[in-house]
A protein has these predicted regions:
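Short amphipathic alpha-helical interaction segments
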Residues: 286-301
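Active-site region of the double-stranded beta-helix
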Residues: 1-116, 124-164
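Acidic, low-complexity/disordered tracts enriched in E/D and polar residues
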Residues: 195-274, 297, 308-310
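Active-site-adjacent segment of 2-oxoglutarate/Fe(II) JmjC oxygenases
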Residues: 142, 147-193
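A short, N-terminal "cap"/entry segment at the start of jelly-roll beta-barrel domains
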Residues: 2-61, 171-231
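Short acidic, hydrophobic short linear motifs in intrinsically disordered regions
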Residues: 266, 270-288
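Residue-level recognition of conserved beta-strand edge/terminus positions
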Residues: 119-121, 308
Length: 310
């Protein structure tokens, strides 16, 4: 792994403030010629096909995902044998790479060519070397949520209510000063843990996941300019990503990935229609003209819909 100074530059300023971390394209090209692998970290944030793939995969799996790409010169190796703390799907897209994969029975060589993929479970030692031509592969990393994490997040509100008073002085000489107090607090905590509602904890976990995904703002400026011009026949496209509906009394909570939208419960049929469509117009919604335009403008503003320029 090269230090950032090897491929970035300094000296650029804006309003007198120095900018840091700026890529130096000439340095990158020179390093690539010398055998370095170019890593496009978090490519799903910038390339729409991967944005859609990662968004769909996160909804299917219920785990955060990310995508990176690795461009390696012919005959070179990007990293020494290493393992990752998350599951990895490898997709070879150009050239070929010979992978060294270590398992319980030792190392195995696997040749990946365009169109071939491979799954590497968490902790699998591996390395890869480009063959006779430049190699490009994409990895999808699955950052698994765990039972331990879920239990910890479920208990955090209870632990936050435990008194933060100081431990009594002299407890090193008289451990009973701690023993009795700890036993009482553990017993109280155990009673409260037994009273936890698992359904409520799961709902909080689902809401947390579906409100902490990356915002869908590509084309958002055009959408903002078009909001006031929306008409019944305006074609709107459903953006990729979450749209999960949760009833909350007579209201409806719409989990949109990076936020929660709360609307009257009567809008559920219209939102079901929006959720299941690739494209639609406000006139397609079974609402009065004013209500459907208000709803569609709001959904454009929230990033669920975007006007189609035709």
């Amino acid at each position: 792994m090269l230090p950032a100074s090897a491929y970035t530059r300094r000296g650029a300023t804006i309003a007198g403030q120095e900018l840091t971390g700026l890529l130096d394209a000439r340095k990158v090209l020179d390093l690539f010629r010398d055998g370095a692998t170019v890593v496009l970290q978090g490519l799903h944030r910038y390339w729409p096909p991967l944005t859609r793939l990662v968004a769909d995969l996160e909804l299917e799996l219920g785990h955060p995902c990310q995508a990176n790409a690795y461009l390696t010169p012919p005959g070179n190796q990007g990293f020494a044998v290493h393992s990752d703390s998350h599951d990895v799907f490898v997709f070879q897209t150009a050239g070929s790479k010979l992978w060294e994969v270590h398992g319980p029975d030792g190392a195995e060589e696997v040749l990946l060519e365009p169109g071939v993929s491979m799954y590497l479970p968490t902790g699998t030692p591996h390395a890869a070397r480009a063959q006779d031509t430049v190699s490009l592969h994409v990895t999808i990393g699955v950052n698994q949520l765990t039972w331990r994490g879920l239990v910890r997040r479920s208990l955090e509100p209870l632990l936050a209510e435990v008194s933060d008073d100081h431990l009594p002085a002299g407890h090193l000489d008289d451990p009973s000063r701690l023993r009795e107090g700890l036993a009482a607090r553990l017993e109280e905590l155990a009673d409260r843990v037994r009273g936890l509602d698992a359904a409520e904890a799961v709902e909080r976990e689902t809401t947390r996941f579906l409100t902490t995904r990356p915002a869908r703002l590509s084309g958002g400026l055009l959408g903002a300019l078009a909001e006031d011009r929306l008409a019944d026949d305006t074609v709107l496209r459903r953006r990729p990503g979450p749209c999960v509906l949760r009833e909350d009394g007579d209201r409806l909570r719409v989990l949109l990935g990076d936020r929660v939208l709360t609307v009257p419960g009567r809008l559920r049929p219209a939102l079901e229609r929006v959720r299941g469509a690739d494209e639609l117009t406000p006139a397609d919604l079974d609402l009065d003209p004013q209500s459907r335009l208000v709803l569609c403008r709001r959904l454009v503003r929230e990033g669920l819909l975007s006007p189609v320029d035709r």
